[in-house]
Regions:
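Extended two-metal-dependent nuclease catalytic cores across DNA- and RNA-processing enzymes
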Residues: 2-131
Length: 131
């Protein structure tokens, strides 16, 4: 996207009922993760527009991810049906599977189906850690 397109998009979004936040030196994904967990926005329906699977760990009853290229919404139910993994445990599952776009090697020959089969409790809302 060219800079003049970004400026035009910014101006267009400014006229819409869409909250925009930008902070110098802070990556957008970190900012989005922070905002989603703020008490101020509790009770709001939040939609993250991105094709990045990293945002799946932020999905909740109040937060969904819209994937524009696939034209799909990802919700808690969608993740449970699709991957058998609850969003609270999605980061742990992705760490096992790996993610080339994030230079995360993962465990060889392990995919989401295998993770869900070996660790069925990751479908629970209780958050598990790698420890």
């Amino acid at each position: 996207m060219k800079i003049y397109q970004q400026i035009g998009l910014y101006e267009y979004l400014y006229e819409m009922p869409i909250i925009q936040v930008a902070i110098d030196g802070i990556e957008a994904d970190d900012l989005i993760g922070h905002i989603v967990h703020q008490d101020y926005y509790s009770g709001w329906q939040k939609i993250i527009v991105s094709s990045d699977k990293d945002f799946f760990q932020l999905v909740s009853d109040e937060t969904s991810v819209y994937r524009p290229i696939q034209d799909t919404f990802i919700s808690v139910i969608t993740l449970l049906e699709q991957d058998k993994i609850h969003p609270n445990n999605y980061a742990l599952a992705r760490a096992m599977v790996g993610d080339k776009s994030d230079n995360l090697a993962g465990v060889p020959r392990i995919g989401m189906k295998t993770v869900a089969k070996l660790f069925p409790y990751l479908s629970e809302s209780k958050q598990y850690d790698a420890d």
